[in-house]
Amino acid sequence: MRSLERTRNVPVLAICDGEDNARMIRGLEIGVNDYLMRPIDSNELHARARTQIRKKRYADRLRDNVQQSIEMAITDALTGLHNRRYMESHLSTLAEQASSRGRPLALMILDIDFFKSINDTYGHDAGDDVLREFAVRIRTSIRGIDLACRYGGEEFVIVMPETDIQVAGMVAERLRRSIAGETFAVNKGTKRIDVTISIGLATLDNKGEPVADVLKRADIALYRAKHDGRNRVVSTAA
């Protein structure tokens, strides 16, 4: 029972004979929460059962609060993607794994074009609608092993393990088309607007390159994409 996730925290109340101390002690050692001795008093049984139920509910609330606190610390509240803090700590681990195994790792920085204009024209609520829908489209365009996060404002980062620059470029282009090809509903669906993105791509060189340098090269590629007219993907070689 304790070995199964779904029953691990279920309270266990044991009933023992008065002379069976060894079994009672063994039960407590393996996870029994409380016990009663025969003959059973129904009032005592009900009281002990209610106590264990209260303890279980309190422990469940504590676990939920801890889990919620952890999620809030690593998740962007608006989009539901990982936040910058989580990305920066996890990226180092992914880069170390890629370098030690001699495997490719690609990174892209995505920026929503003219996002300030969206806020100025349609309001900040519309801007939030765009960010949320953008996050949804990111999730549908990447794999489970990829790491997507909101980097800040209208910038997002996607880290793709086991992915070379050619494959990452195809993923980036597919994502760019999915954004530009379908309008975004804003202001509770009362209006639909066109949105485009610019993407900068870079890959880890597997020669001990700091991850900060990979991010910098992706950012330079993003700058080129925006400088060259936006709504495009630009990659930079390692």
Mark where each language-model region is.
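C-terminal output helix
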Residues: 39-49, 167
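Alpha-helical scaffold within the catalytic cores of cyclic-nucleotide enzymes
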Residues: 135-136, 167-185, 217-219
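A short pre-motif secondary-structure segment
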Residues: 147-150
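Conserved nucleotide-binding and Mg2+-coordinating catalytic segments in signaling enzymes
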Residues: 70-89, 110-124, 132
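Short regulatory alpha-helical coupling segments
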Residues: 70-71, 84-104, 135-143, 161
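Short catalytic/binding micro-motifs of nucleotide second-messenger systems
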Residues: 97, 140-145, 177-190, 203, ...
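Catalytic-core segments of nucleotide cyclases and related cyclic-nucleotide turnover enzymes
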Residues: 165, 169, 204-238
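Alpha4 helix (beta4-alpha4-beta5 surface) of REC/receiver domains from two-component response regulators
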Residues: 3, 8, 17-34, 145
